[in-house]
Amino acid sequence: MELKDVLLAPIFAVFLYVWAYLRRAKQTNSLTKKYYFLALNLRMFGAIALGFVYQFYYNGGDTYNFFHDSLIIWNALLDKPDVGIQILTDTPGTLNPATQPYTNYMYFYVDKSTMIIVKASAVLGIITYHTYLANAFFLAFFSFTGVWAMYRAFVDIYPMLYKRFAFACFMMPSAFFWGSGLMKDTLVVGALGWAFYGFYFGVIKKQKILKNVLILIAALWLMQAVKIYVAMCFLPSASIWLFLQYRANMKVALVRALMLPIVLLIALPIGLLTVSKLTEGTRYSFDSIGETTKTNTEWNAVSGNASYSLGE
């Protein structure tokens, strides 16, 4: 972080808080209103804390490496806009003579999932004059909107548990620390919240179906692009929920009894095919999962199980 973080980040923070304030009436009710800005404050604090820990304790690390790569794209956009746009639109790892003077200096150019956060930071840099803390604030705000959307869905299902849901969604230190800064986890947390919201209101409750299904699709795309295993966990759970919802509405007992084995016979091969297609070319594919497990086991043996990872 630099002097411009101190000068510019507060301006963008004020903008985000004003935006949140203008939307509060539509996003809250009499029970949840008091948690709205608490949730946002914790996300913003998490963004600051993560940056400080990585800068002053670790002297660098993932978040600053992501920022480093996004700075290269931002500089390309300033120097040669057509080349910068090409970097943003090229498939990561593409050997393009026009972009190589920039991409050769990027740490994560060959990593498709990591380039999502790198590109997001570069695009935000157009607005924020590529200021680390301002970029982190925007990402934290996205995470906040997703988590708040999920909280609204939870409260709609179990209104009397609004206090417990508030604690679970907003106040867990590890969640608002790791899910608020310039990290891949921030995008995934926000996307997961929006996916749950879109699925519940669009598919289960059938409210504003088109809008909510589009939200669901966009959130699922982002999840699978950044951390595919999160989407792999969400989709089966959502499918089971949907099946149980329809099964409960069936009036004939025999039909209800026969539905489970029939659905399992259909769902298992479709599920396996879907997972295979989703993970194709990643280290979570059926062909690579054994090697991934072996690598993780060897690393844990070397580190004495002392390593920490949020996944790739």
Residue ranges of predicted features:
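Extracytoplasmic catalytic/substrate-binding loops of multi-pass membrane glycan-assembly enzymes
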Residues: 54-69, 78-98, 108-120
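Transmembrane-helix motifs of polytopic, lipid-linked glycan transferases
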Residues: 18-22, 123, 135-157
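Membrane-interface transmembrane helices that cradle and orient dolichyl/undecaprenyl
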Residues: 156-158, 195-211
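Loop-to-helix entry region of an early transmembrane alpha helix in multi-pass inner-membrane enzymes
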Residues: 108-119, 127-145
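Alpha-helical transmembrane segments and terminal signal-anchor/GPI-anchor hydrophobic tails
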Residues: 221-312
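Membrane-interface alpha helices of multi-pass inner-membrane proteins
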Residues: 176-177, 211-231
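Transmembrane and membrane-interface helices of multi-pass
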Residues: 166-172
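Short acidic/glycine- and proline-prone juxtamembrane loop motifs at membrane-interface regions
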Residues: 181-186
